[in-house]
Amino acid sequence: MNAKASSKSIFIQVNTKIQLAPSRLRFVGLSFLRGLIQYVALRPMPQLPFLLLDAFTTQPLRGNPCAVVLDADALTPATRQQLAREFNQSETAFVNRATPGSTEFVVRFFTPAEEIPLAGHPTIATVAALLHTGQVALPADGTPLVLTLDLLHGPIRVDVQPTIGSEPPLVWMTQRRPVFGAIHAPEDVLPIFGLTPDDLLPGASIQTVSTGTPQLMLLLRDHAALRRAYVADPEALGRYRAASDFFSPHLFCLGGATPTGHTFARHFGTPPDISEDPVTGSATGGMAAYLWHHGYINSPNFIAEQGHDMGRAGTVQVRVSGPRTAIETVQIGGTAVVVLEGSLRAEL
C-alpha cells in the first residue's frame, strides 16, 4: 500500500498483511491509512543540519566556500559522495555527532570526485561551524580552545584563538609532517598549463610535497607567469595525475597579491572537481614546506594569498617549525564566516 499526503510532502510506504473479510477490508484499510498519515504528519521529520561557510576570509562571498554537514553518522560513504557532488564545492565536510562537551570530532572530507585524507579550508570551516552551532565554545578565560579532528588517516590538532572585537576566531590547523616526493620534468608538466621553462623561477624544481595531501608544487617566475597559466589540456592533466604521485597542482610565486602578502597562488583541478580552487589550505601547507626547505623564504612565518583574481580573495597565515632540512610542523591559520544554514532530509 502506498499513500501520499501532498499537503505536507509526506511519503509513506506500508507493507503489512491484513486478514479480514473482503467487506471490511476497504473500511479498515482506509481507517488505518488515515491514522497513520495523521501520526506521521504530527511527528517532526528528522533532518541533518548543514552550513555553507566561506573560509580564509572575514567577509562573506570571499575566500573558499565549503559545505559542512553535521550529525552525519548515518550517512554511508556512497551517500556522502553523492552529497559532495550535489553541493558541488571543492570539498564538503561531514561531522559525526560527539558527546556534549567533547573536544574530539570524527570528520571526513569529500571532493565531488572522491574522499581525501586532509583538507585545509574544510578544517577551518568545520571548526567555525562547530563554534557557530554551539557544539564547542571558546574558554571564558581567553585561552585558546584545543580540538582534535579524527580524519581518514588519523587525528590532527586544531587550536582556536579568540580575536579582538567582532572578528571571527582564528583557527590554526596543524598539518602532517612534510613528505617530499618526486621531482617532475618541466617539459612534461609546463605545457599542461600553457607555460614554458622560462616561466619557472630559475633553479626551482617541480616537486610533489605532502603535508597530508600530496600536491604538485610549481614555483613560477612572477605574477605575470602565474596569471598566464591555465589548464591547456584537461585530459593531459588527468592522465599525468593518474600516473603520478600527486592529487592536484599548486602554482605560485613570491610576492603577494596585496602589499601584506608574501606569496600568491593558484590551484587547478580536473573534472568532476572544480576547475580552480579559490584558496587551498592543504596545498598552502605543502607550499610552505617547499619554500622553507629549499630556502626561498627567509622567515618561517608568512602570509599566503590566493583567489584575488577570481573575486574570492583569501588570506592564509602560515607557520613552519623546525630547521629547513628537518621540518617538524606546518600550521595554517584562517577565519571563516557562515553564509547559509539549512537542513537535509534524513532519508537520504
Model-derived features: positions:
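Short, positively charged and aromatic/hydrophobic N-terminal segments
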Residues: R26, Q38-A41
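N-terminal, positively charged, Ser/Thr/Ala/Gly-biased leader segments
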Residues: M45-R62
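Acidic, low-complexity central loop/insert segments
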Residues: Q82, T103, F110-Y240, W292-A346
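Cationic, low-complexity basic patches in intrinsically disordered or flexible, solvent-exposed regions
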Residues: S9, L20, Y39
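Conserved phosphate-donor
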Residues: N88-V106, E235-D273, F302-T325, T329
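Glycine/serine-rich anion-binding loops at beta->alpha junctions
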Residues: P60, V107-L131, A265, D273-A288
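Short alpha-helix boundary/capping segments
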Residues: M1-I10
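Intrinsically disordered, low-complexity proline-rich regions
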Residues: T16, S23-R26, S31-R34
